[in-house]
Amino acid sequence: MQNIHFIGIGGIGISALARFLKEKGFKISGSDLKESKITKELEKEGVKVSIPHHKDNILNKDLVIYSAAIKEENPEFKHAKELGIKCLSRKEALPLILEDKRVFAVAGAHGKSTTSSILASLLDDASVIIGAILKEFGSNMIYKESQNLVFEADESDSSFLNSNPYLAIVTNAEAEHLDHYGNEVSKLHHAYAEFLDTAKIRVINAEDEFLKNYKNESTKLYPSKDIKNCTMRIENFKPFTSFELKDLGEFKVFGMGYHLALDASLAILAALNFLDIETIRTRLKNYQGIKKRFDILYADENLVLIDDYGHHPTEIKATLSAAQEYAKLGGYKKITAIFEPHRYTRLAANLKEFAKAFESIDELVILPVYAAGEEPIELDLKAVFPKALFVEDIKREGRFLVASKGQVFEEGLIIGFGAGDISNKLRQKDE
């Protein structure tokens, strides 16, 4: 089996799998609805990418792997089935992709990309497959001739149960993506327990409401007791967080916020199974962050523009706390958040929590909901966010942002939140 075709290859997670299999020696092709930065990069790397989907794209393929967004009526999926070509969902393909690796898997509702990327910096001999772009490598995949592989495991479709972890980290088990679990929290928690039980080494945030009751042997982080003297500073506009962990001394990591110290601590405790503490302390300094996580796009004395993937109230609240600290340290007098809600179901289920998450900032701008394929839900957002400015669009013009109504945002700390298209709106074309 040599020719593998990915339907939906432009996705951040599926593109990492395609890159990994290409490095393993398979001939990779793919397709997507529209061209993107990821599809352009894949083409430069030698992957044949077809835009848009067309039934002829799967001719002469041995295997088709499709993303979670692909429906049965997709022309490529339908034609592959008609021709008898084996078709696997991303979830079903994981055992094939990870089969010969010792997998260090990171799961959790929040913080898994950051934790897995920090772990990748510490275990620098390991291959890496994550759902974010590692800034020090410029990719969501690193291939090494190694048995070890750092993998960001996804609970949203229970695919983390197919990752066969040697080491499992769970950052938290907050209820997200409940639709996949029949809207039953107990089923989600059972899946997390099954994921942990599979691993030989387990590292957990033991102050999480569910994880604190996990009975099997594990390395437990109690953040309120184990993380001390957490301080933040800015060096040439770059954010850094320092903290002490248990009796292991002080650590310094790129990025800002207590939540970053928590994620780094989980990665450190996992890495201690394989490395000495001084090696960990040194390698942690190599970490340069990931794209779309407190990602500083522009900074001077009057303006800092930040892009963040946060799309759940818990994430937004934690990141805004870090943003307030950055603004204080940098002398920025005003904080503006630009929010592109992601999925109607998530917004409807967490309206009060979203309103509370944004209540501490000076100015809130709300873009239309990024539906991600969902049917619209009628919501009175103006009643929930009475002080917000609602705009149809926003775009980057030089250093500044300009809204569709003509408002210009040009000073203070400006931070965009969302998992949809907002990142493209905040960036220059070449970023």
UniProtKB/Swiss-Prot annotation:
Superkingdom, natural source: Bacteria
One biological process term in Gene Ontology: cell division
InterPro entries: Mur-like_cat_sf (IPR036565), Mur_ligase_C (IPR004101), Mur_ligase_C_dom_sf (IPR036615), Mur_ligase_cen (IPR013221), Mur_ligase_N (IPR000713), MurCDEF_pg_biosynth (IPR050061), UDP-N-AcMur_Ala_ligase_MurC (IPR005758)
Zinc is among the record's keywords: no
Listed pathway(s): Cell wall biogenesis; peptidoglycan biosynthesis
Record carries keyword Cell division: yes
Catalysed conversion reaction: UDP-N-acetyl-alpha-D-muramate + L-alanine + ATP = UDP-N-acetyl-alpha-D-muramoyl-L-alanine + ADP + phosphate + H(+)
The protein's name in its UniProt record: UDP-N-acetylmuramate--L-alanine ligase
